[in-house]
Curated annotation (Swiss-Prot):
Membrane-spanning segments: none
Assembly with partners or alone: Homodimer.
Gene expressing this chain: mshA
Protein name: D-inositol 3-phosphate glycosyltransferase
The protein's Enzyme Commission number: 2.4.1.250
Protein purpose: Catalyzes the transfer of an N-acetyl-glucosamine moiety to 1D-myo-inositol 3-phosphate to produce 1D-myo-inositol 2-acetamido-2-deoxy-glucopyranoside 3-phosphate in the mycothiol (MSH) biosynthesis pathway. MSH and WhiB3 are probably part of a regulatory circuit that mediates gene expression upon acid stress (like that found in host macrophage phagosomes).
BP term (GO), one: mycothiol biosynthetic process
Keyword set, alphabetical order: Glycosyltransferase, Magnesium, Metal-binding, Transferase
Reactions catalysed: 1D-myo-inositol 3-phosphate + UDP-N-acetyl-alpha-D-glucosamine = 1D-myo-inositol 2-acetamido-2-deoxy-alpha-D-glucopyranoside 3-phosphate + UDP + H(+)
UniProt: Mg(2+) binding residues: 340-341, 343, 367
InterPro entries: Glyco_trans_1, Glyco_trans_4-like_N, Mycothiol_biosynthesis_MshA
Region (Disordered): 1-42
Free-text disruption phenotype from the record: Increased intracellular levels of ergothioneine, 8-fold increase in reactive oxygen species-producing cells, decreased resistance to the antibiotics rifampicin, isoniazid, bedaquiline and clofazimine. Increased oxygen consumption and extracellular acidification rates, which are further increased by membrane uncoupler CCCP, indicative of electron chain dysfunction in the absence of MSH. Absence leads to alteration of transcript levels for 139 genes which probably compensate for loss of redox control. Loss of induction of some pH-inducible genes at pH 4.5, including the redox-sensor whiB3.
Length: 480
């Protein structure tokens, strides 16, 4: 793990080795930070957050909704509690969607009409980026210039719109990719198709254009550098958070009673979207080798999983384990916490995972996790301390790992691991995440303003005079 650069508020940035598994960090990338002193004076008053393909109000575990949706909503709520307004732009997906939803004081969601409400696949959304961008720009145009201080785009589709908004509004663009096409394509599950070249091109453009890039882990920082040639000095590592008021240890007996589960049954939970990428089939196939183990699957079909929405149910029947597999729909946070407390362990066998929020939420409830050693999961789970990491997706290996962890959980070691899991998860608070987000925003605003001052406004003034956008600065690899 790379060293974490830490600004202690004095303007001097010291480097230290990170504590393994600590919460949100303020890494500036492998090349180190700039020497500029960024302060609270660069805090934004209002953030325009862009989420083209999925609403932060969508139920995680359905459609394309998952950890990214939780991240957007929770970070917006916590920024608002610090006096920073957040306006979230997302595509309307139903005629009943109101134009504006006031979620909480300081947080509102703008549902932008762009294309048909239903039946539009995520891979068709690039055809509606112009319509979405028009809706975003029109919303800003009713205000005086300078209404938004910064744009934060989530996922590459939003980055395409954010790039335009940045140029039009003359404010910095911060971008969070959440996933990268090249990473997903390198670890495809059976039944999954590769991400299209269009996405790879679009991601490269956004990486080149963004003023700052936010990634979930140091590993993701290395990926965006190696795959897209990102400038390390423009990267900030910000770990997602967990709601520690909801996800906390509790009474397992009470949780099992609420779900109608026997107290002495061995229970493994899988929570997530039902699609090959998340690999729920691995859990079922492993369970077939472990008599007496009950599997609870909570989530709905998504992505390529929509082609066979009942595929997992049929697989359980084919494996002869239907009687000990319980399928639940996507759960609210409160019900999800109950499920985590009821389980002996939670399985996260994904082929690709930029972080793995479910793993941290489960550990916050004191439940150990068995997870694939991919992406951000080695950060989310401390191997041998709060759970077990499995290399690869061989079913026998997963069955052995689950069986071993279940045996540990049944003895004194299980109590030690449960306490360690809760302590580890506590380092991933949304307060820590918000601190790191604000640090990134300050850098973006401070560096952006410093660059404008350095140029003396001459280039911008000249461009405005000839009818160009208020801000236009081509980056490497992006033509005029």
């Amino acid at each position: 793990m790379a060293g974490v650069r830490h600004d202690d508020g004095s303007g001097l940035i010291a480097q230290r080795r990170p504590v393994r598994g600590e919460g949100a960090t303020r890494s500036r990338g492998p090349s180190g930070p700039s020497n500029r002193n960024v302060s609270a004076a660069d805090d934004p008053r209002r953030v325009a957050l862009l989420a083209v393909h999925t609403s932060p109000l969508a139920q995680p575990g359905t459609g394309d909704a998952g950890g990214m949706n939780v991240y957007m909503l929770q970070s917006a709520l916590h920024l608002a509690r610090r006096g920073i307004e957040v306006e979230i732009f997302t595509r309307a997906t139903a005629s009943a969607d109101p134009p504006v939803v006031r979620v909480a004081p300081g947080v509102l969601v703008r549902n932008v009409v762009a294309g048909p409400f239903e039946g539009l696949d995520k891979y068709d959304l690039p055809t509606q980026l112009c319509a979405f961008a028009a809706g975003v720009l029109r919303a800003e145009a009713v205000h005086e210039p300078g209404y938004y201080d910064i744009v934060h785009s989530h996922y590459w589709l939003s980055g395409q719109v954010g790039w335009l908004a940045r140029d039009r509004w003359a404010v910095p663009l911060v971008h969070t990719a959440h996933t990268l096409a090249a990473v997903k394509n390198a670890a495809l599950a059976d039944g999954d198709g590769p991400e299209p070249p269009l996405r790879t091109v679009g991601e490269q453009q956004v990486v080149d254009e963004a003023d700052r890039l936010i990634v979930n882990t140091d590993d993701e920082a290395r990926q965006v550098i190696s795959l897209h040639g990102a400038d390390p000095a423009r990267i900030d590592v910000v770990h997602p958070g967990v709601d520690l008021d909801v996800f906390r240890p509790g009474d397992r007996r009470a949780a099992r009673a609420a779900l109608g589960l026997p107290v002495d049954e061995r229970v493994v939970a899988f929570v997530g979207r039902i699609q090959p990428l998340k690999a729920p089939d691995i859990v079922l196939r492993a369970a077939a080798k472990l008599p007496g183990v009950r599997i609870i699957v909570a989530g709905g079909p998504s992505g390529s999983g929509l082609a066979s929405p009942d595929g997992l149910v049929r697989l359980a029947d084919e494996l002869g384990i239907s009687a000990r597999v319980t399928f639940l729909p996507p759960q609210s946070h409160t019900d999800l916490a109950t499920l985590f407390r009821a389980a002996d362990l939670v399985a996260v066998p994904s082929y690709s995972e930029s972080f793995g929020l479910v793993a941290v939420e489960a550990q916050a409830c004191g439940t150990p996790v068995v997870a694939a050693a991919v992406g951000g999961l080695p950060v989310a789970v401390r191997d041998g301390i709060t759970g077990t990491l499995v290399s690869g997706h061989e079913v026998g290996q997963w069955a052995d790992a689950i069986d071993h962890l279940l045996r540990l959980c049944a003895g004194p070691r299980g109590r030690v691991m449960s306490r360690a899991a809760a302590r580890h998860a506590a380092t991933f608070s949304w307060e820590n995440t918000t601190d790191a987000l604000l640090a990134s925003y300050r850098r973006a605003i401070g560096e952006y303003n410093a660059e404008r001052q350095r140029r003396g406004g001459e280039v911008i003034s000249d461009l405005v005079a000839v009818g160009k956008p208020r801000h236009w600065t081509p980056r490497r690899g992006v033509g005029a």
